[in-house]
Every structure is written in C-alpha cells, then in structure tokens.
Amino acid sequence: SRRQRQMCIRDRADIDKCQRNGGNMVKAIVGANWGDEGKGKITDMLAEESDIIVRFQGGSNAGHTIINEYGKFALHLLPSGVFYNHTTSIIGNGVALNIPYLIKELKSLTDRNVPMPKILVSDRAQILMPYHVAFDTYEEARLAGKSFGSTKSGIAPFYSDKYAKIGFQVNELFGDEQELKEKIANVCTLKNVMLEHLYHQPLLNLSLIHISEPTR
C-alpha cells in the first residue's frame, strides 16, 4: 500500500523490508561541486540493485571510469549501469546527445565483449550538432588569453541553442520533413551571421545537408 511504502522509505536502515512490502526506492545522485565528485562510480555501484538508470543532463564532456570484470572503461555519454544485463539505461531530455559519439561508445563496449546494453533515448533529447563543436573551438580561439578552458565538446553552444529554442530534438527527425528543412535553413542563416562577422570562418553550406529517411 502507499502507506506501507511511505513508512518503509522513512526507515532507511531497512531497505530489504521496504522491497518485501512492495516499496519502490528512487535514488538521485547529484553533484554539488564542479564535477569529479565520483557520481559515476556511485551510480555504477547502485546500478547493481536497480532496474532503471537515468542520465538526465550533461554530455560527452563528462567522464567517469568504471573497472569491472570486462576491464577498465572511461564512459562519457552512456549512463553508468550499462554493464548490468538487468538494467535499462535511459538518456533523458536534458542530455546533449552526440549521436556519432553514442554509437562509438556503444561499439567500444561490444568490441570488448560487453553485452549490448538496453538503451532508451528520450524523443525530447536535443542533438549536439557538428557546428556546436566548431563554435566552441572558435570561441576559445577568439577569447585567446581570456578563454574558459573549454573541452571543445560543443557543450556551451549546445545549451545556448537549447534555451534559445533553435536546437533540434530527436522527435523532429521523425516529424514533417519540410518543417525540418525550413528550420535547418533558418538556423544556418543565424549561424552564418556569427561565422562571417564574429569568427571570420567558412559559412555553413545548406546545399550539402541531406535528409535521409529515418530508420524506425
């Protein structure tokens, strides 16, 4: 019952009793510093007794090292917990989804005999585009001695676009093709203004962008 779950969750010292009485435990791991607190290692440890692992934000600029029976791994985009067959790993809508990097990281696991993990990606996750990485690099060069020391992974330009509402969500790849083309053209126009007048770099060429039929 709901009352049983509330009572047993208050009793933190008796998790087994909570589970026997039908209680569901949700654990949130949040870093309160500037990173490197050990979030990934803690998540990997808790994943052993969890059914679902959710990464809710961040991108491939982050990193955590996991050592297990398969070897030593440095994960950057995949959620901790991908090494457990019983878990489902979810990439949430706050994640900077670098699709080529995600595929590369999955392959790096299976190449070392790790079973293919069960992965779900939110259709509202926003896609990190190649020009985000380029803009990150250009901005660091422009700032020169006053640069922020970016990892040049495109994270700052990505989140700037996200909150300016000019990014691309996963669901848009499966929506109306004409609307997607029009949005791409509008975004390219905005980006080219910055490329030409602020960074003095080659412009984005819309004619080179090809939209393929997505695999469902």
Question: Where are the language model's segments positioned?
Answer:
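Non-transmembrane, aqueous-exposed alpha-helical and coiled segments at domain scale
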Residues: 24-208, 212
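Single conserved hydrophobic/aromatic residue that forms the stacking wall/gate
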Residues: 1-11, 209-216
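Short, Lys/Arg-enriched N-terminal segments with co-localized hydrophobic residues
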Residues: 10-24
